[in-house]
Amino acid sequence: MDASEEAKRVSIQVTSLSTQLIESVDKQSHLEEQLNKSLKTIASQKAAIENYNQLKEDYNTLKRELSDRDDEVKRLREDIAKENELRTKAEEEADKLNKEVEDLTASLFDEANNMVADARKEKYAIEILNKRLTEQLREKDTLLDTLTLQLKNLKKVMHSLDNESTVTNNSNRYSTILSDSATSSSTSLNKVPTSYSLASQDIYSGIVYSPSISSIRYDISLYNEFLKFVAALPRCENIKATSTESKLIRRLVNDEIQPILKIDNASGIGWLVKKTLLSLIIDGLVVVEPLSGVNATYQIGYNSSSPAKQATSNMPKMFKFPLDSPPVAVHAACSFCGESRDDIIEHARMYILKTLHKTDDGKEQVTNTYPLCHWCLLKLRQTCEIFAFLRSLKVGAWHLEKLTTQNITKEDLEKFSEVTKHTKRDGRVSSQDKKTKRLSFMAGLGINSSTKNKPKMEIFSSETNAKPGQPTTNIQRAWLQLCKLRCILHWTHIGIWAVDDSISSKIGPLVEDDSDEDQNDAISVRLQDKALWKQDAKRPFSSSSAEESQKSDAFDFESGDMENEITGESSSDESSSDGSSTDNSTADSSSEDESSLADSTTSSADSSSPESIDNGEGDDTVTKDDKSSIKSANNNEENSDCGDKKGRSIIKKKAPQRKIQKKKLLQDLDDLEEQFREESAIDQTEFENAESNVKQNISSKRASSGDENSKKDNNEKTLKTNLTIGDKTQEQIGENSPSSGLHASSSNDDNFDDAQEQQ
């Protein structure tokens, strides 16, 4: 029994020892795994330490470079101070030289004035001598005239004495001469036209009807619509867009153009084109041209030399066909009125109407062509002239006065409807003048002629020289031009062969010349006769801008003799004073803009200084504050100069804060380095202690199994404590590793650099 119990006890002990052995082997394997892990962590920490050392070296090099740059900045500031001193000295010297130059110029001007005065004195003396000489010459001329008269009288006396001997012979001859002269006079009287025949010829060669310019009215509703049209032009893209504020185009189309053209009754035009033709004419997308250039030589009023001479000349050919060739026409009927006669040239369809369409590229393409007779040609051309004139007002070729729809009051309407009035006696003749003219037909033989004949002085002014009823503003002149074009349109509807036959005046705008010394005096463009306009047409018309002249090439805005207007001096003075005030305001605004630009450049220069670059190492809060300060500074720069100063003060206040934050960051980096070193040393000591404990446990197990059983619990406790300590240290190392701190600082540096770039 005892042996069996001992065997059981031994077997139990063996099993327990085997289990302990297995557990110890497992623990040993587990410890070896932990050892490998710890070795790996140590290797990874060594790489991190190397990266940290390299970054530290880079930081030191950057710090040195910054110090070098600071030294350079100081040196440059010293150089700037020296240059400023030199500049002040140079400015002082320049001021001295300017004063000397001013003194020299003053002395030169004094000498020049003295020379001019001497020259004028000499000129005055020479003029007096010339006057005396001219008077002497006149006296000599009168003497010569008297002597020549005396000689003529003497010659007559001599001839009379010579002819006394032959009086008898000359008497017969004289009778025959009288008979011949009588017959010739009778025949000539028969040939001379009477006053009645001359009057009849003048009547049938004159103008049918043409109203004078002074009879044009400015108090009708259509003129008010014209003023609204002028006021709405600057705000609209084209003249069709003015229909919302003015009824001018609508009334012109409905009351005058549509009844004359009768597009709805046109047989040769499609219904789609009928709807869009007037809008195309308003936009200027219509072309009226002859089928051949030779057709222009067959129109009424065309004057040219003989075609044979032109054919034999060496001049270049203007037309495809020779000048003596017949005109080119179309057999098709007119698209508007249906004219189909071919009996005379005037009834032929020698012209065509082309409708255009604008492509996406801005080019114009021909969509339709329609033949035109002479009657419809004049009507269409005149409608195109009317809308081209309205488009020229939109371009600004007529230099219209500024007018707004809100300011169209009764006073403004009176201002733009005023015309020139009589300023003298309207050509009336006094009763005393009539008496003197009745009493004698010879000059100076009337009653009290010596007392009645008084010297007259001519006053050259627009008020005295201008006829009554003339326009005083460019808006009135534009209205006159529109009335003239409308009148021609009505005459084309009545039926005429030519348009330019009865045009006796050309109307143009008032043009202000900036080169004149007196800018308040306006220059008026006078209405002139056709003969004067032809003489003055050779002179070029000076427009205010090249673009307006290019756009208004189809119209004649040529002016004749220019006269200064005195009637609008008060308005011109007010406008000039307003213009000067606006000029001053614009100059002040421009100076403020320049100062704001200068301040913005200085603020940008301050922000890009090396001090701001040095302060680029900050956290996220620093970058957000910088962005907000930059935005506020930019807003203040755009608003006013005071805002610029505030923005610069904000940026300057941020600079010391950045320096403090930089120092804090450097201290934090140093603390992290010390903590990392201490923790790594502690980890190494703890790991070595754990290794020694494991080795001691293994040796003790191999030496004696009994001792292992007794020390089992103690070894397990120590191993657990060591493992927990190692895990905690690894977690702390992972949390406090330098890589994470460096990444955070680098991200903050990037954010700060972005903020600096924005600033």
Curated annotation (Swiss-Prot):
Cellular component GO terms held in the UniProt record: cell tip; cellular bud neck; cellular bud tip; cytosol; mating projection tip; transport vesicle
Modified-residue entries (Phosphothreonine), positions: T168
Record GO terms (molecular function): guanyl-nucleotide exchange factor activity; identical protein binding; phosphatidylinositol-4-phosphate binding
Biased composition (Basic residues): 648-664
This protein's UniProt keywords: Acetylation, Coiled coil, Cytoplasmic vesicle, Guanine-nucleotide releasing factor, Phosphoprotein, Protein transport, Transport
Biased composition range(s): Low complexity: 577-589, 597-612
Comment text on domains: The N-terminal domain (1-374) is sufficient for the exchange factor activity.
Assembly, per entry: Interacts with SEC4. Interacts with YPT32, preferentially in its GTP-bound form.
Main function: Guanine nucleotide exchange factor for SEC4, catalyzing the dissociation of GDP from SEC4 and also potently promoting binding of GTP. Activation of SEC4 by SEC2 is needed for the directed transport of vesicles to sites of exocytosis. Binds the Rab GTPase YPT32, but does not have exchange activity on YPT32.
Further comment: Present with 13200 molecules/cell in log phase SD medium.
Protein name per Swiss-Prot or TrEMBL: Rab guanine nucleotide exchange factor SEC2
Provenance organism: Saccharomyces cerevisiae (strain ATCC 204508 / S288c) (Baker's yeast)
Designated gene of the protein: SEC2
